Regions:
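Soluble non-transmembrane domains of integral membrane proteins
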Residues: 22-163
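Positively charged n-region of N-terminal signal peptides that target proteins for export
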Residues: 1-6
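Bacterial N-terminal signal peptides
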Residues: 7-16
Length: 163
């Protein structure tokens, strides 16, 4: 029963964030046998001005496999990017979880292979909780496996320091 194979994709940002030393840029392949994937080492990171939008950063070349938390000040945004490839695309529902409920702004953008937006989710502790896709203290985003390849962009802003 495929509906039993829901995957929770966890981004466990210990404290506020965790400094990732692993190489990124690899695709995350999800099969029906996957039950949990820690994405932290598979994300490319970019620190930008707070005013930059998705269209501004999509084609930038400065993405890094890690970031230094003290580079992310109140006037900056931290962007993350990774690619999901579904082994057997179908209508199965998956979930991306950002595991830090203290972040002020967490935005998730899902794009198809032609860079068309499939979904966008604007969440965070400073936003209205009733607009979240799931009533939960963590930031949970649904991801459909109907597309074989999905690029995920994650933007985080926080008025406090990134530790």
């Amino acid at each position: 029963m495929k509906s039993l194979y829901l995957i929770v994709l966890m981004l466990c940002f210990t404290s506020v964030f965790w400094h990732s030393n692993n190489m990124a840029s690899e695709q995350v392949v999800i099969s029906e046998h996957s039950s949990h994937i820690d994405l932290l080492g598979k994300i490319d990171w970019l620190v930008t001005e707070k005013s930059m939008q998705l269209s501004d950063i999509q084609h930038l070349q400065d993405w890094q496999p890690s970031y230094i938390p003290n580079q992310v000040s109140q006037d900056k945004s931290l962007w993350g990017k990774f690619i999901i490839v579904f082994d057997d695309p179908d209508e199965e529902q998956y979930f991306l979880t950002v595991g830090n409920p203290h972040l002020d702004y967490v935005d998730v953008f899902l794009l198809d292979e032609k860079n068309r937006i499939l979904g966008s989710f604007l969440m965070g502790g400073s936003r209205d909780h009733t607009t979240r896709p799931f009533k939960h203290r963590l930031f949970i985003t649904p991801i459909s496996s109907a597309q074989q390849v999905i690029t995920v962009y994650l933007r985080v802003n926080d008025d406090g320091p990134f530790i």
